[in-house]
Swiss-Prot record:
Residues 204-239 form the UVR domain. The UvrABC repair system catalyzes the recognition and processing of DNA lesions. UvrC both incises the 5' and 3' sides of the lesion. The N-terminal half is responsible for the 3' incision and the C-terminal half is responsible for the 5' incision. This is UvrABC system protein C. InterPro entries: GIY-YIG_endonuc, GIY-YIG_endonuc_sf, GIY-YIG_UvrC_Cho, Hlx-hairpin-Hlx_DNA-bd_motif, RuvA_2-like, UVR_dom, UVR_dom_sf, UvrABC_protein_C. The keyword Nucleotidyltransferase does not apply. GO terms for molecular function: DNA binding; excinuclease ABC activity. Pfam families: GIY-YIG (PF01541), HHH_5 (PF14520), UVR (PF02151), UvrC_RNaseH (PF22920), UvrC_RNaseH_dom (PF08459). Coiled coil: none annotated. Gene3D superfamilies: 5' to 3' exonuclease, C-terminal subdomain, GIY-YIG endonuclease, UVR domain, UvrC, RNAse H endonuclease domain. Belongs to the UvrC family.
Length: 610
């Protein structure tokens, strides 16, 4: 047994300067990371005789060692604390689980700019607008812009190899800058300028210019042009009716609503950019028991904004609840430093800002209610499945499925559920190779070999393994897994899910490795859980298969041609703008591709015609 932590001796060595501390347990695992303006004062508070917080008492009872890092300023300590939390994911810290990047709309720096969605680092030349709360909001905006201002959205490789306009031009969704006779550079630049103003929220400026153009065109008897401008004006006005525009300034704002109930905390962020509400997103940080609202919110603020190190993701203004604004100066300084400009916090908003905050708080509470109801449904389904199978507990389930088209591009999927539902970060796909096309038994065997042949952590061993298939698939799966579970502390139950004759949901037959077959009522919660994990596995496999099949079909026609390796294949597809364009090309056109001789062009031409 390890001796108790000697806090008295330790505290004698601690400075009064700002810094970060890391607390370790007996296994040398970091269990908590904190920051302090005065390290001595903050660390002493953990070891007082009377500590009210249950969480703090539990934390202190597990401390075996504390490391301290002194910093120059409190702001520096805040940033270092965030980096340590991200590195160690300590048990007693509030952890923000949603660390996805936010999408932007990009107007590229091309001569004829392209409009597209962008995620990740902003390395490409061009102008970025956003962030948007999700890809759906970006796609909706791009679709809308395509109808009002038909700026091209095709890839540069496709654009550069076109000699005539594509279908998007024919249906009025692209101005056709790839063909110089259709639209001049000046006209296209004007179109891009309208898009830029629209994305900046300057709708009135766009309307004013379009109205002027419509009137001029009408006076000059260019009625077709006047009608086009009229349609654009009407479309923008319809958008304005649907999109609430803030009366507030044109500053970017995030409005942070907060709610915490039944051990669940939610921060609902309403994103406002250039006066327009782009959308919102709810975040549910992982919180230890008995964590105060203030600690949850402070931890979220730091992790959320410092995780997105691109300055444009930090708005000029952040609106939040007064009761959660304990000590904002360090985080305000840190965010201003990262953003390279002043970031303002507003804690007692009135007018439009106050209404936004009230709306965000309501949405946060609604999101918690929805999550609790969903959790109750999942819990009920797990309980029903436990009772159906006579199991004491179910902590983890995995399900496998195979997808292919007539044996082509076979993909296996594995999805994972715990008692909160799908664990999507643990979903896996397996690219199946070296088997006879269409041999599902061999495909399943290969996937299971790759999944279970390596050493598994105890918590990663499933309680149930579902196989989407009948007796044959299940028996093959059992043969494979039985080779590896000898050293496992528990053996999973294996169940096959066979579709009914009509393949309708609710008519599934469940099969055990003993050969027992049984059905559940179509309204049984246990069956709904099985259908859920089966459908997740099926969809995950199909998505992977379609992507692989598409890639194979784009390149396979070139792979068998002697003298055409990966570099030449890439050059051909890039120069021509795709496989279909290459198939339509003449020998002379193919010979223009860098690195392709006339004789090789003839070989390629003949091979593609077969």
């Amino acid at each position: 047994m390890n001796p108790p932590f000697d806090s008295a001796s330790f505290l004698k060595t601690v400075t009064h300067q700002p810094g970060v501390y890391r607390m370790y347990n007996a296994d040398a695992v970091v269990i908590y990371v904190g920051k302090a303006k005065d390290l001595q004062k903050r660390l002493s508070s953990y070891f007082r005789k009377k500590v009210d917080s249950e969480k703090t008492r539990a934390l202190v009872s597990n401390i075996a060692k504390i490391d301290v890092t002194v910093t120059h300023t409190e702001t520096e300590a805040l940033i270092l604390e965030h980096n340590y939390i991200k590195q160690y994911l300590p048990k007693y810290n509030v952890l923000l689980r949603d660390d996805k990047s936010y999408p932007y709309i990009l107007i590229s720096g091309h001569k004829h700019p392209r409009l597209s969605m962008h995620r990740g680092a902003k390395k490409r030349k061009g102008e970025y607008f956003g962030p948007y709360p999700d890809s759906g909001a970006v796609r909706e905006t791009l679709h809308l812009l395509q109808k009002i201002f038909p700026v091209r959205q095709c890839e540069d490789t496709v654009y550069s190899n076109r000699t005539r306009p594509c279908l998007m031009y024919q249906i009025g969704r692209c101005a056709g800058p790839c063909v110089s006779s259709i639209i001049s550079d000046e006209e296209y630049a004007e179109l891009v300028g309208f898009v830029r103003l629209f994305l900046q929220g300057k709708d009135q400026q766009v309307l004013k210019q379009l109205i002027e153009k419509m009137e001029v065109a009408s006076q000059q008897l260019r009625f077709e042009d006047a009608a086009k401008f009229r349609d654009q004006i009407q479309a923008i006005r319809r958008v304005q009716e649907q999109q609430y525009v803030s009366e507030d300034s044109m500053d970017d704002m995030d409005v942070l609503g907060f709610a915490q109930e039944n051990g669940i905390a939610c921060i609902h962020i309403l994103m406002i950019r250039q006066g327009k509400v782009l959308g919102s997103r709810s975040h549910f940080p992982k919180i230890p028991q008995n964590t105060s609202q203030q600690e949850v919110f402070d931890s979220f603020l730091t992790q959320y904004y410092l995780s997105h190190n691109e300055a444009r993701t930090i708005p000029s203004r952040i609106i939040l609840n007064q009761e959660l604004a304990d000590d904002l100066e360090p985080i305000q300084k840190a965010l201003s430093e990262v953003a390279g400009r002043k970031v303002h916090f507003h804690t007692s908003p009135t007018g439009a800002r106050g209404r936004y905050l009230k709306l965000s708080n309501t949405n946060a509470l609604t999101a918690i209610t929805t999550k609790i109801n969903h959790k109750m449904t999942i819990n009920q389904r797990f309980k029903a499945l436990r009772e159906t199978l006579g199991m004491e507990s179910i902590m983890r389930m995995e399900c496998f499925d195979i997808s292919h088209t007539m044996g082509e591009s076979t993909i296996a999927s594995c999805v994972v559920f715990n008692n909160e539902g799908p664990v999507k970060q643990e979903y896996r796909r397996y690219n199946i190779t070296g088997i006879t096309g269409g041999d599902d038994y061999a495909a399943m065997g290969q996937a299971l070999e790759r999944r279970y042949s390596k050493q598994l952590d105890v918590e990663k061993i499933p309680d149930i393994i579902f196989i989407d298939g009948g007796k044959g698939q299940l028996n093959r799966a059992h043969e494979i897994i039985a080779q590896y579970w000898g050293d496992w502390p528990k053996r999973p139950i294996m169940i096959g899910i066979a579709k009914g004759v009509t393949r309708k949901p609710g008519l599934e037959t469940l099969i055990t490795v003993d050969g027992e077959e049984f059905n559940l009522p179509s309204d049984a919660p246990a069956l709904h859980l099985i259908q859920h994990i089966r459908d997740e596995s099926h969809n995950h496999a199909i998505a992977g298969h379609r992507a692989k099949r598409g890639k194979t079909r784009r390149t396979s026609a070139l792979e068998g041609i002697e003298g055409v390796g990966p570099k030449r294949r890439q050059a051909l597809l890039k120069y021509m703008g795709g496989l279909q364009e290459l198939k339509r090309a003449s020998v002379e056109e193919i010979a223009k591709v860098p690195g392709i001789s006339h004789s090789l062009a003839e070989i390629i031409f003949q091979a593609l015609k077969q």
